[in-house]
Design a protein with these regions (language model features):
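Short acidic/polar inter-strand loop motif in beta-rich domains
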Residues: 77-79, 123, 137-145
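Bacterial Sec-dependent N-terminal signal peptides
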Residues: 1-19
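Ligand-binding face of N-terminal immunoglobulin V-set domains in extracellular IgSF glycoproteins
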Residues: 110-138
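Extended, solvent-exposed segments with strong compositional bias
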Residues: 90-111
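Beta-strand-rich interaction surfaces with strong enrichment in secreted/lumenal proteins
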Residues: 44-45, 100-107, 122, 149
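Extended low-complexity, serine/threonine- and proline-enriched intrinsically disordered segments
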Residues: 64-92, 191-204
Length: 204
């Protein structure tokens, strides 16, 4: 099995906050996908300033045509809202609209497919980290129809990792153990126990 290792610098919130996660709150929104554009199955991680983009794709089963807009929220490592203001983490303006859409043809149920690529001409991220894209009906900004979460990473350290079936639990059975070393020569980490959060993801 291939494992994906993700390290994110911790930004500690001052107060308890809402934790963001990908979810749909409007029953008219179906088949929400959040992935790397051009890849069939992928975790929504892209490099800051890289060539890849995040694709958010969904179907809206509205009786009539609906226009959707979105806001971008920068999050801490625990997916609570960070203390950064929009001008600090993005170029562009909140409330941009989703302009890529197409009505379904030849189907028994009428719906509209919407597609958003990020970054785009309207909004670009300035910093790495976790992001929550909140989409709402343009006529009612207070009602979020869904939230799409993704991460933008910045390769500031190098990581050497190994995977072994010889673990503290068992040997070559149902568990795996990951060991890794971080080369942070050009990125000082004063308190690694508290300054870093580490996640290990299984790839597919």
């Amino acid at each position: 099995k291939i494992l994906f290792l993700l390290l994110i610098t911790v930004l500690v919130p001052l107060t308890a906050q809402v934790t963001y996660f990908t979810n749909v709150s409007d029953k008219q929104i179906k088949t929400l996908q959040v992935k790397v554009a051009g890849e069939m199955f992928s975790d929504p991680f892209i490099e800051l300033g890289g060539e890849n983009r995040i694709e958010v794709n969904f179907d809206a089963f509205n009786p009539g045509f609906g226009r959707y807009a979105y806001n971008l929220v920068h999050c801490n490592a625990d997916w609570t809202q960070s203390n950064l203001s929009p001008i600090e983490y993005m170029n562009g303006f909140q409330g941009s609209t989703i302009e890529d859409f197409a009505n379904a043809m030849g189907t028994t149920v009428q719906y509209t497919n919407y597609r958003l690529l990020f970054p785009n001409d309207d909004v670009q991220p300035k910093v790495s980290g976790n992001y929550a894209l909140q989409v709402y009906n343009e006529d009612d900004p207070s009602q979020i129809v869904f939230t799409a979460c993704f991460s933008i990473f910045e390769p500031m350290v190098s990581v050497a990792a190994t995977v072994s079936g010889n673990t503290d639990i068992d040997t070559n059975q149902s568990h795996q153990q990951v060991s890794f070393a971080i080369n942070n020569k050009n990125f000082p980490i004063t308190y690694p126990q508290t300054d870093l959060k580490i996640w290990v993801y299984q790839n597919n």
